[in-house]
Amino acid sequence: MLFQVRMDVHLPVSMPTDQANQIKSVEKAYSQELQRQGKWRHIWRITGQYSNISIFDVESNEELHTILQGLPLYPYMKIEVMALNRHPSSVRDDDS
């Protein structure tokens, strides 16, 4: 199942820089492992924002939910999820 996920990060201004950097470091390692596994297929930064658009390829809604809740930045995110389906007019074989 493919999902488009928009993640907007809102770290508290009061969070110490060292704590924020530690959370970001763990987040990066977690997200890169999911990318290597093929579950986090794409990630793009939204210009000028602390936000991204990502494409996940997972087995179920529950798996995506578990992955998102596992993100160290999850408590500081606003997340929007859209389920995706292959379009019948697509000329690509690898987009399902």
Swiss-Prot record:
EC number(s) reported in the record = 5.3.3.4
Q: Which domain of life is it from?
A: Bacteria
User: An example of a Gene Ontology BP annotation on this entry?
Assistant: beta-ketoadipate pathway
Specify the enzyme's EC class, one word: isomerase
Keywords, sorted A to Z: Aromatic hydrocarbons catabolism, Isomerase
Recall the GO molecular function terms of this protein's record.
muconolactone delta-isomerase activity
Q: Name one Pfam family in it.
A: MIase
Record's catalysed reaction(s): (S)-muconolactone = (4,5-dihydro-5-oxofuran-2-yl)-acetate
- Recorded protein name is Muconolactone Delta-isomerase
